[in-house]
Amino acid sequence: MTNCLSFRNGRGLALLCALLGTLCETGSGQIRYSVSEELDKGSFVGNIANDLGLEPRELAERGVRIVSRGRTQLFSLNPQSGSLVTAERIDREELCAQIPLCLVKFNILVEDKLKIFEVEIEIKDINDNAPNFPTEELEIKIGELTVPGTRFPLKTAFDPDVGINSLQNYKLSPNDYFSLAVNSVSEGAKYPELVLERALDREKREIHQLVLVASDGGDPVHSGNLHIQVIVLDANDNPPMFTQPEYRVSVWENVPVGTRLLTVNATDPDEGFNAQVSYILDKMPGKIAEIFHLNSVSGEVSILKSLDYEDAMFYEIKIEAQDGPGLLSRAKILVTVLDVNDNAPEITITSLTSSVPEEGTVGREIALIDVHDRDSGQNGQVEVFVLGNLPFKLEKSVDQYYRLVTATSLDREQISEYNISLRASDGGSPPLSTETHITLHVIDINDNPPTFPHLSYSAYIPENNPRGASIFSVTAQDPDSNNNARITYALTEDTLQGAPLSSFVSINSNTGVLYALRSFDYEQFRDLKLLVTASDSGNPPLSSNVSLNLFVLDQNDNAPEILYPALPTDGSTGVELAPRSAEPGYLVTKVVAVDRDSGQNAWLSYRLLKASEPGLFSVGLHTGEVRTARALLDRDALKQSLVVAVQDHGQPPLSATVTLTVAVADRIPDILADLGSLEPSAKPNDSDLTLYLVVAVAAVSCVFLALVIVLLAHRLRRWHKSRLLQASGGGLASTPGSHFVGVDGVRAFLQTYSHEVSLTADSRKSHLIFPQPNYADTLISQESCEKSEPLLITQDLLEMKGDSNLLQQAPPNTDWRFSQAQRPGTSGSQNGDDTGTWPNNQFDTEMLQAMILASASEAADGSSTLGGGAGTMGLSARYGPQFTLQHVPDYRQNVYIPGSNATLTNAAGKRDGKAPAGGNGNKKKSGKKEKK
């Protein structure tokens, strides 16, 4: 490819078209251009983008740049046009001197591909220099006796241009005595000589003025002038003569300054002044006069300045020998500089990738290095290698370029940074070497998932923990770095008891600390199985799981719960039955309690906290069985009150209490008969207090009785067909009816309004007792164990109701019994015609539910001695081995209304007032008492 460029010089050249840009591919990746010297900065050299197969914009994108080994940049890249341009004005004479072919070599690096292209540019000479003589004037002395035809050497002109632009011819100004002869040598140099054509006559003309013109072959032609002054002397017919026209000498570049190279010698056969020879170093352009010294007297040539083979390997020195009158002769000295290994190799990092990803492919380019040694021959032969056992190697590229590539895969987790040392050694003796160091960072890729130090974890947290409490901390390790090692924690979604697991436990995504979102209850669940996921922040992210078993530790947060006797909901008190004939160790009842805690916190112990008759009963420490501690005596009260405490073994221990009422009698009718005559014993010192209590209770009783009357009237209106109180009529309107219902199917005396009525025929006072609830939840509640004082209702109060017959009590209907078929059973089938007017829907249902609960709770207990006989009414039959609902007698057979002639029957035919056939039960009881 040829480019025609134009330029202007200072003298007004219009246009010079020359062959400038011949581009060719020489070998692999070699580009060649040609350009003229003295072009302006930025002048076009060649379309480098097109020759590289790139678009102009890709020069910057792909990192295309010039590599010139530290020399002055003569050329640059224009990223806009994609062309190679001059970086400054180029002077071929300064760059290449007299070398005919001036070549500038450099390399172009394509950064992203780490590819090198060799570029060679030929600098074309232009005729920018005129021939120039060393001096402007030359004085020649010629004897008048000089024979015509004698030749006198003249100063040669020097033109730094080459080729046709260099010195081409000499021309002497016209004269009558002298002519010009030009001698050409093999190197192409031309030496002018002044030829004497006619004999001189000093007497006619002593001085001759001549002009020697040196011209080049350029267009336009440049020339230089030398003014010659010829002085006619007396006769000196022999010039000095060198022993040899050319001297050759070789010298090592490292010789010291002042070293003598050689001595030249010239002789003159004349005598006297005409034979005195002096040596002159011809004035030559360049730095020869600064490097070499010629002794004008001895002809000794020595070194003034250190030689450097790398700067110049050859010197040509021109010398002259002149006698006294001025005759001279010429010779030249050829100095060859010998190379020594005085330069260590140079390592230049042309391109460098400071970081590479780990686990990359083998052969990944890291750096492009240029290795150069300024020495020559074996001294310039360089070998470069990587020091140490590192996973890198060097591959030869073009010229003296090497590529540093990976030899194996890199693993950042093993080595994250490499300090690569490169050593270049030449082949000299001794060899010289140079080292350079490259720091390479290995970029992490996400090739390692987070790992936990353990396969699974176990954590423990006590129940009733505060919300937000820290439970446990898990930590995973990731050998990667930065985001690839930034770990986040999460819980795998799951459900627990129908609720999402995230509502129970949360985890801090950054620290791995688990927190409780709610207060745990050991009684609800005892352990949680969690799956913790640790994920890094790489792309794509990697994760791993670990199982965490969270165990809830039991705390003593539940007090014992008493199942039997169940705490009543209507304020009544249950009664347990103990026969007076019971022997020591007789099982009266059993307190059954459970604790929702576990372990030692649920280990229960029972003890008798308080008893109305100390020493009469005992409680099993671990069984809760209430047994008689001794035989029952006549002096023992009919009604015994016991407070039993149930305590667990937690820290601190929790407890609950229950109040038991034990009736000492063989049968329920005996209890009913005895309760009517019981008078609460008052302490002597409590008379005043009793009076105050009677007055207070009397006031409350009035309000209470009024309410009872209203309620009873309402019920009588609804149950007007009931024959429960037919015989008594309205006589008991002022007294609330009592219902003997067992709680849990066992307790015999459960009064709806929680009071007891005792009416006697021979007393003017009736006793109305309002007992307090006799159970408590904790040991602190002890007031329930105290016996309430009775409230006396006077006869006057009863007379206000207008019926004095209420004080006359009819004997109880002892024949009020139910046949076996009429008693309630599990099937609930009774003859509707035989059931009297007693309401049975509500109470039978309650009785059935209570007995089912009791049967389920205690059916397995076979140690009881109580049975379901007629004397005990089956109140404690739950401790029997065959307790069923059929063993429970009808509670209505033992109910009567004190102070009333009315009796409850289950048949319409038994209302004639006659004593029933089975009315001897009370007589038998009286007989037993008399015997005692």
From Swiss-Prot:
Residues 714-932 are cytoplasmic. The chain crosses the membrane at residues 693-713. Residues 806-841, 902-932 are annotated as: Disordered. GO terms for biological process: cell adhesion; homophilic cell adhesion via plasma membrane adhesion molecules; nervous system development. Residues 1-29 form the signal peptide. Residues 30-692 are extracellular. Residues 30-133, 134-242, 243-347, 348-452, 453-562, 570-682 form the Cadherin domain. It is found in: Cell membrane. CDD domains: Cadherin_repeat (cd11304). It is a single-pass type I membrane protein. Glycans are attached at N265, N419, N545, N685. Keywords: Calcium, Cell adhesion, Cell membrane, Glycoprotein, Membrane, Repeat, Signal, Transmembrane, Transmembrane helix. GO terms for molecular function: calcium ion binding. GO terms for cellular component: plasma membrane. Residues 922-932 have a biased composition (Basic residues). Potential calcium-dependent cell-adhesion protein. May be involved in the establishment and maintenance of specific neuronal connections in the brain. This is Protocadherin gamma-A3. The gene is PCDHGA3.
